């Protein structure tokens, strides 16, 4: 069945890990009649957690699209992961949704994941609703959670359904709109007498009425006149308040036991915005702003919000149709690449189940298989109106590990397999470090990289190990030293002869500088390039640990030559000998990379973070507030000391903090750490005979 845009609700379900998001999604599917039985996260049988790794870990690892059709309305639910290592799912899903349903556990309350989901919704201008799950449990404390929500989410929080209990302990739910109470038997609603919850009831009604009154001048007059609002006025005022970000309605129930889900679905329909009047701002081919309206009569424009890479089926692109409609065989332009993509048969998706559709209309969500160039964040549009929607900014990788191959010969497979995984995971990075000869992958945490490792094995048959990346050290000198290099060899016939005197000294910058100050013809000019080449080749390995030498100035001062035996190779060798003789006497040092660290953390954690930076041999340069209400600590820290900083900042801030690093410069490695670095270089084979002598 095809739905008009006013009968569609695109909703991201987000919150902390374990708050009940996937169970709620599963319960809504079951409640709507789309499933014969309700799957369980514990059993790995839910519709949205269909990836083998999700079933194994009993947690969502990526955003999953689950449409629920109920009483003529299509709810495109996007179940996002709550684990911070997989928060890319929230960033993907929020771009396809008009609304965010923040799931809060009635047992554990407003945890960090709920706070971050709420902030992400607000930052992206999305309508927000809260569902407090597990309210039928003994230790659930709805009203304490409600007060905590008001502190953390602000004054927009407005309870609409509250839990209570009958004398026999039966859970009931009070609908504050209708001021009626209901219990549930086998998921079916049964009205009961309104239980006595004391002074709270009147306070809740007044608070809701005041919130509604603030959405409209006429309603405000009626409120101050002491008149009660009609049901229609309550719903309309609430709807407007939600759309404008003035009200965050709070509902509650039990997903596992099918309690109060009917009230949640009804109000998601009535209160949350449809795509119909939700115009989207894009850029045309000239970079000028253009407004896209949600109408099938408009030229087609669709946004790729998620990609799944499958080694057997191929690539599956999840699309939110912004305007027009998607049909099989249509040719759409990728606004990023300029390439034309031919659409295959449009698909509707329910977890892993795919069903062919005639078309996907404006405002709806679907998928298309085997697009060639499209990737997450791309806009596909009709050639008559090329537009580009803003691409999301995903969290950057913060934990980097080196890849080791379990089976010889798999080295070549790794890069292609990781490239496929990077198509579906924008927070994953991969590079070949030419200096350390290691393949480096980056992710958001240990769990993230562990899942990548498992997917490489299960999806692509490539088994890898992970280890700490090697540090790309440098070497330099602290004082000047002048030495002669003389290469003479007679092997019969023409011999080899080259003789140079070179002054080596420190210089600014991270390069090797060569000059010549030769007077007369002691070294002919045509051999100067050979001398320079010899110096540069020698400087590729320092004398302490075999690392490249930087900040070195070599000046050719004198030398001699033989009219027959001198050659370019002879002068290259002579320059190397001069280098080898001079460097041990020039105060050689090892340099380590220093990175600029920007740690964004709550104010309460600044002391702990700055203390830890100091322990890591870092220097705190300053602190400034950022736009998200966090404090940004700016510091410089040796790269070698940042190995487990991802885990530390997450544990210290309970997941609220994050950080970025950027290379700043090289500095001299403290003397006490030099032996360990030299020994490591020896084990790696950096030290050849010439470097050891």
Feature locations, PLM:
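Structural and coupling elements of P-loop NTPases
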Residues: 1-693
């Amino acid at each position: 069945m095809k739905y008009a845009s006013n009968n569609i609700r695109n909703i991201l379900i987000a919150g902390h890990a374990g708050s009940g998001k996937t169970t709620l999604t599963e319960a809504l599917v079951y409640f709507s009649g789309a499933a014969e039985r309700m799957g369980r996260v514990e059993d790995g049988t839910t519709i949205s957690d269909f990836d083998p790794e999700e079933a194994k870990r009993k947690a969502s690892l990526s955003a999953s699209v689950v449409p629920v059709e109920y009483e003529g309305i299509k709810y495109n639910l996007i179940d996002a992961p709550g684990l911070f290592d997989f928060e890319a799912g929230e960033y993907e899903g929020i771009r396809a949704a008009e609304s965010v349903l923040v799931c809060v556990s009635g047992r554990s309350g407003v945890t960090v994941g709920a706070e971050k989901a709420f902030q992400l919704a607000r930052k992206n201008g999305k309508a927000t609703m809260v569902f407090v799950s597990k309210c039928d449990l003994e230790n659930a404390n709805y009203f304490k959670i409600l007060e905590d929500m008001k502190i953390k989410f602000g004054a927009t929080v407005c309870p609409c359904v509250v839990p209570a209990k009958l004398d026999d302990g039966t859970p009931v739910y009070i609908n504050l709109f209708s001021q009626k109470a209901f219990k549930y038997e086998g998921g079916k609603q049964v009205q009961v007498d309104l239980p006595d919850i004391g002074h709270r009831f009147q306070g809740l009604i007044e608070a809701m009425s005041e919130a509604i009154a603030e959405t409209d001048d006429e309603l405000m007059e009626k409120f101050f006149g002491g008149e009660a609002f009609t049901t229609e006025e309550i719903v309309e005022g609430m709807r407007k308040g939600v759309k404008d970000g003035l009200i965050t309605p709070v509902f509650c129930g039990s997903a596992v036991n099918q309690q109060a889900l009917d009230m949640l679905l009804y109000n998601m329909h009535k209160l949350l915005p449809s795509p119909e009047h939700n115009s989207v701002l894009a850029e045309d081919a000239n970079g000028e702003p253009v407004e896209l309206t949600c109408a099938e009569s408009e030229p087609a424009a669709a946004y790729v919000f998620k990609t799944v890479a499958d080694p057997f089926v191929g690539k599956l692109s999840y699309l939110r149709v912004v305007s027009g409609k998607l049909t099989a065989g249509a040719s759409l332009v990728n606004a990023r690449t300029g390439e034309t993509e031919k659409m295959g048969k449009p698909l509707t998706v329910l977890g892993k189940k795919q069903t062919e559709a005639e078309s996907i209309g404006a405002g709806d969500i679907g998928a298309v298989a085997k697009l060639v160039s499209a990737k997450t964040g791309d806009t596909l549009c009709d050639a008559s109106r090329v537009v580009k929607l803003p691409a999301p900014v995903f969290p950057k990788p913060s934990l980097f590990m080196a890849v080791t191959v379990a089976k010889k010969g798999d080295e070549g497979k790794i890069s292609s397999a990781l490239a496929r995984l990077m198509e579906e995971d924008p927070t994953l990075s991969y590079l070949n470090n030419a200096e350390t000869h290691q393949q480096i992958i980056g992710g958001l945490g240990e769990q993230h990289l562990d899942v990548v490792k498992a997917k490489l094995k299960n999806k692509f048959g490539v088994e890898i190990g992970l280890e700490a990346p090697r540090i790309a050290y440098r070497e330099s000198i602290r004082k000047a030293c002048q030495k002669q290099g003389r290469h003479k060899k007679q092997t019969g016939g023409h011999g080899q002869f080259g003789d140079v005197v070179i002054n080596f000294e420190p210089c600014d910058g991270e390069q090797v500088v060569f000059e010549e100050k030769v007077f007369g013809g002691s070294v002919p000019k045509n051999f100067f390039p050979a001398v320079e080449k010899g110096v540069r080749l020698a400087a590729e390995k320092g004398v302490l640990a075999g690392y490249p030498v930087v900040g070195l100035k070599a000046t050719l001062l004198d030398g001699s030559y033989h009219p027959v035996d001198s050659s370019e190779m002879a002068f290259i060798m002579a320059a190397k000998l001069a280098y080898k003789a001079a460097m041990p006497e020039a105060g050689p040092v090892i340099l380590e990379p220093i990175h600029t660290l920007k740690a964004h953390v709550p104010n309460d954690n600044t002391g702990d973070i700055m203390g830890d930076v100091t322990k890591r041999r870092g220097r705190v340069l300053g602190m400034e507030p950022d736009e998200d209400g966090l404090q940004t600590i700016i510091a410089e820290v040796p790269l070698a000391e940042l190995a487990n900083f991802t885990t530390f900042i997450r544990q210290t801030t309970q997941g609220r903090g994050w950080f970025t690093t950027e290379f700043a410069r090289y500095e001299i490695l403290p003397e006490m750490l030099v032996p360990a670095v030299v020994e490591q270089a020896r084990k790696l084979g950096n030290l050849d005979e010439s470097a050891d002598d």
